[in-house]
Amino acid sequence: MVIALDAMGGDFGPVVTVPASLQALSLYPKLRLLLVGNPDAILPILATSKSIGLDRLTVIPARSVISGDARPSQAIRVSKDTSMRVALELIKSGRAHACVSAGNTGALMGLSKLVLKSVHGIERPALTTLLPHQKQGKTVILDLGANISCDGAMLVQFAIMGSVLSKQILGVSNPRVALLNIGSEETKGLDNIRHASRILHTISSIHYVGYVEANDLLMGKTDVLVCDGFIGNITLKTMEGVIRVILSTLQSSEKKNKLNWFMQIINSWIRKYLFKQFNQFNPDWYNGAHLVGLRSTVIKSHGAANQHAFIAAITQAMHSVEREVPEKISHQLSTVLSKNNH
């Protein structure tokens, strides 16, 4: 399997992506990587490495990088020879099976549509991630910011794609699908949400369970949670912020303790237990958002991802390719559209 990596994208660029690439090669013996970016920034880091698997890594030169604050429309116009564009073109030319980038989200979405095209029947691809919940499973949640405004038909498309992802990546045989809403009653919510709900009730191949509220996000009440990108992005980042504060507080509280030795032991045990419970929700463990709805696999890593988190994104790309997620989304969508047209 060959994956193209945008080595220059994200807040840290090659400082994170190159070491992460080397570690991924040591973890996955059958993996080959195409590291796209400025050789002057990449090669010095590689020169200091003694990692195994260097023979499975190729540096592909790219002159420039799309900045994180660039407007997507402008970035796309001047994207030629950027690390992101070159990485995507490697998929189009057949040299790579997937692409991973921590770069500008809007530019990645626009360029992916331009270079790789959407699956037939998908209006716009969506950003999705696999969010852990308290029942030791994971929930597919989409959209996470690729589409700020969505009509009911788009939400239905997201539901279909999320259901396929849950089956293929998580192995859920009959995924429960829900819409994120402000209440569980059918009369609640905006027109587009209620419209999507009515359509989903009519699709027999989708196990639609109705509405789920944000306070149930980590409770495991659904396998797929669908929302527009505006709500999804705010919801995810709020949850990630809270989890990081909790983990940071648990780690730092030991230094502030002035209890007697017995209470220190009890307090330490409780703190370690809580840390273990909350650490499963650490955003680093589930980094890597799929751009589902494209004809090939593209994974968006968090811009501030550390080395461990970027490896998680590479792993997500491998799983998507191995399980033929884009092809199966296309098949499922064509089946649903065919039934609805009869």
UniProtKB/Swiss-Prot annotation:
It holds the Pfam family FA_synthesis. The keyword Transferase applies. Its main location: cytoplasm. GO terms for cellular component: cytoplasm. SUPFAM superfamilies: Isocitrate/Isopropylmalate dehydrogenase-like (SSF53659). Coiled coil: none annotated. It comes from the Bacteria. It is an enzyme of class 2 (transferase). It catalyses: a fatty acyl-[ACP] + phosphate = an acyl phosphate + holo-[ACP]. Belongs to the PlsX family. This is Phosphate acyltransferase. It comes from Blochmanniella pennsylvanica (strain BPEN).
